[in-house]
Amino acid sequence: MYIRVTTYGFDEARIGEALAKMDATIRDDLKAIAGLESVEECRIGEGQAMIIARYDSEASATAAQEKIQVIFGDMAEFMTSQPEIKSGDVIWTL
């Protein structure tokens, strides 16, 4: 199992619009990515978010990057900072 954590800034005034776009378009795009097992997004501060994506392997995460970059490009209008990414193999789980 491999985890990728992405943090970024977003326009709080447009959060409803962003969530509607995610539900309408991005959900299906993410479901179609091979090896992507789950995605959770949470607000970590005013205008700040964190995405936690779980993949079956590092190879799947690497292979998905082109598609993920397209998705982030589609959502760029809502973002106020460049995404920062950290990732690694899971070493313990509950």
At which residue positions do the language-model features occur?
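Short S/T/G/P-rich N-terminal loop/turn motif that feeds into the first structured element of a domain
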Residues: M1-M50, D56-V70, F78-L94
